[in-house]
Amino acid sequence: MLNLSEQWLEMPLAPHGTTRFHYVWLRDNCHCSECRHPDTKERILATASIPTTIAPTQAEIGETALTVVWNDQQHVSEYPLQWLLAHDYATAPPETDVAKPKVKLWGRELQAEIPRFDYQTLHSDESAMLAWCEAVRDIGLTVVENAPLVEGEIERFAETVAVVRETIYDRLHNVRATPGEYNAYNVASTTLELKPHTDMPNYNNPPGVQMFHFLVNESEGGESTAVDGFKVAADLLARDPQAYQTLATTPVEFRMFSSRGDIQSSNPLLTLDHSGELNVFRFSNQLAQPARISAEQMSEFYRAYQLLGQMIEDPSYKIEFRMKTGDIMVTNNLRVLHGRNSYDANSGARHLQLSYMDFDDVLSRIRMLKQAQSGAS
């Protein structure tokens, strides 16, 4: 039943059929108390200490586990068959992360279908909290309704999900507009149209989740806008692969500075993961610094950059909606661009409070809620 070769063993593993596991991988993943801490389950064994000649002196498949005796000090390892099945990398390994995003691209059609949730229900119903976290993960835009009109409530809401991500704006940021008063310190604090953008591209690791709590929204105009950057990027790749490649490889410098700090970064607008999939979309024309790339790259970069900007402004991608007093708009800041229309500051007051979380914390919350549902750990 077992076939031992020089570097791996082959074994039957229903329902996968015959599969193989490398000796070094098996030895590295021994879960005995000498190799893993019995309480924390963290690895104690130093992977670098495993001999290059590691191999079994004995191996046996039982009803529920594979047992291996190693030529390294006759160490004995036991691997439950269900664990091997879950980690079988040789025969199309299944996706085991229950929090892995199931991205749903969208355009103008989402305007009538924005996922909406009730604030109090999210606090009292874990299934509602799970649905909300999954909507933030998969769609990247939600509205939470009926939040208390209390300053600092957005910070408390964030802490029911995970932890607040501090930035140059601190834990909580106020955006106010009062009739007869004017204090512009950035574009967002003016009455001008705020073009769709992502926040904090000047960070190498931008905050992944952005939350706007509308404490007062009485002015005329100022409708919120949003664009799915991943949808724009997917269509750009299909339409102009060269432009996509340019934006995925050319660094763009962003900077934000104040009395609290001077945060700068240089990254492509489209950041790809190890498999070539888009995982971060950065775009903030107001924070972009003068391009410092070679003369040979400049024309192609601007061609691609302008094309991207034109697509972002295309009505087929942009949605527009009115936020009510008491609403919280939540976006995946690594994907969804947000903005607003211009407004009349003399027509009524406007007060928003803004806070951030990391996207990893939303994924963590999904895992914990799923584990609670299944009773797993």
In which residue ranges do the predicted regions lie?
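Active-site environment of non-heme Fe oxygenases that use a 2-His-1-carboxylate facial triad
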Residues: 88-90, 94-141, 146-377
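Motif-centric detector for short Cys/His coordination patterns
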Residues: 1-125
